[in-house]
């Protein structure tokens, strides 16, 4: 039976983003395989320092050398630069002159967490604790009553340092923040959800045993804990002032659901974009345009500091790279193009009120192209031009990448920002593209494997 004129016209003029499994079922197995590599990366890389260490090993194993602005480079050469052990840049030299611009892919590798305070240790009621200061936008109540692991670095008086990683191995102890039992939480229950657990209540259990022969001293449990730390690492209490220690969920990335189509883990924001970005970088053997993959720090607190995109370290790198070819950095930036590789909120059917269904990203419909982020009247957004949207969409369509558009929730429901605005400050065209995430900024976020895989395909196409 022939299609009605209305149906034929609707098919020609209307469009809905399809479920990938319905139109490209062959991608299910490919996505699962790609996700296995990502799971391994996620489990090894719980902090920005650990990501840099893991990525540096990957780059060196694939022939990358440390960038030297005094050297000359030719097409196909692979170089990288580490910024203070907390951010990394990687490039493959393209066949086109650098004056034609470079292709940039920028993700961030910091995630919401609990940081140790400079003077963190105390004892109360014969229990030793650490005081923490939360990093990034978290729901504080989500961090209580769950296993935590400790990661970081402590410098000692003699200038040496020790790296910490406690709570990830099965035989390790974990750390813990308490909450009230419901039988005694009548007063606490009247708090707002935001204040259910307060920042000053994010205190981590360390120990409860006193130091031997300690009847005549104060804080004997704290002393016992300090003795253990001194025996393990050779540190004293004063050394915490020259430390960077982070507490993160002591969990592993796991498949979700009977069909294993989803993946839960800590740090999807934004390592779910950082991983496919660096894989696409490594696989770019002979790109037309020189590539620049950015894995930056500090995005969760505004891209501040000298390892965040608000600093000049990326611009300086582009300038030095331009000088290697006798080019003007301003000319290079003006002709360059960038994907700000960051996640967006996936539509959550349990909480539909904060989304506008026609302009939301959905699981299993591909990477999400976000024209603008920000809050209220697009405040804090870059807002990509129609010309650049067309350029990026054309690349993805040409390479059969599944993509969708989406905003960060309904108007005035909240908002957020990415590194796009700081890339735009360098006079570079930029748009956000990444993976939709359920329960973003929680200790255990969820993504779709098919969306992850198509984000990788988008990055690969962008570099090719």
Model-derived features: positions:
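N-terminal hydrophobic/helix-forming segments and targeting peptides
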Residues: 1-464
């Amino acid at each position: 039976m022939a299609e009605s004129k209305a149906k034929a016209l609707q098919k020609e003029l209307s469009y809905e983003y399809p479920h990938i499994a319905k139109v490209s079922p062959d991608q299910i197995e490919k996505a699962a395989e790609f996700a296995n590599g990502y799971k391994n990366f996620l489990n090894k890389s719980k902090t920005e320092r650990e990501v840099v260490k893991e990525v540096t090993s990957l780059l060196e194993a694939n022939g990358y050398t440390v960038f030297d602005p005094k050297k000359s480079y030719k097409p196909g050469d692979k170089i990288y630069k580490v910024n203070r052990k907390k951010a990394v840049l990687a490039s493959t030299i393209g066949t086109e002159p650098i004056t034609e611009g470079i292709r940039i892919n920028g993700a961030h590798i910091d995630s919401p967490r609990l940081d140790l305070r400079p003077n963190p240790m105390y004892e109360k009621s014969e229990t030793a604790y650490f005081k923490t200061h939360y990093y990034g936008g978290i729901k504080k109540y989500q961090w209580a009553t769950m296993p935590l692991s400790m990661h970081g670095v402590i410098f000692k008086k003699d200038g040496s340092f020790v790296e910490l990683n406690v709570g990830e191995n099965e035989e390790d102890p974990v750390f813990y923040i308490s909450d009230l039992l419901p039988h005694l939480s009548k007063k606490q229950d009247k708090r707002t959800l935001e204040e259910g657990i307060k920042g000053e209540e994010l205190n981590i259990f360390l120990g409860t045993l006193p130091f031997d022969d300690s009847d005549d001293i104060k804080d004997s449990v704290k002393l016992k804990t300090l003795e253990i730390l001194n025996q393990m690492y050779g540190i004293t209490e004063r050394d915490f002032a020259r430390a960077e220690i982070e507490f993160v969920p002591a969990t592993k990335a796991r498949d979700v659901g009977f069909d294993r189509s989803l993946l839960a883990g800590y740090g999807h924001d934004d390592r779910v974009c950082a991983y496919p970005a660096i894989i696409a970088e490594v696989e770019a053997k002979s790109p037309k345009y020189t590539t620049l993959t950015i894995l930056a720090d500090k995005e969760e607190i505004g891209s501040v500091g000298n390892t965040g995109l608000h600093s000049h370290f990326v611009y300086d790198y582009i300038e030095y790279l331009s000088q290697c070819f006798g080019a003007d950095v301003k000319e290079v930036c003006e002709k360059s193009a960038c994907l700000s590789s960051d996640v967006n909120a996936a539509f959550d059917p349990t909480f539909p009120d904060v989304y506008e269904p026609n302009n939301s990203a959905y699981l299993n419909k591909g990477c999400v192209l976000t024209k603008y982020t920000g809050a209220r009247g697009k405040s804090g957004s870059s807002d990509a031009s129609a010309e650049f949207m067309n350029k990026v969409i054309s690349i993805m369509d040409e390479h059969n990448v599944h993509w969708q558009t989406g905003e960060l929730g309904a108007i005035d429901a909240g908002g957020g920002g990415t590194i796009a605005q700081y890339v735009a400050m360098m006079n570079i065209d930029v748009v956000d593209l990444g993976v939709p995430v359920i329960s973003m900024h929680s200790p255990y976020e969820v993504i779709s494997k098919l969306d992850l895989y198509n984000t990788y395909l988008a990055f690969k196409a962008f570099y090719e």
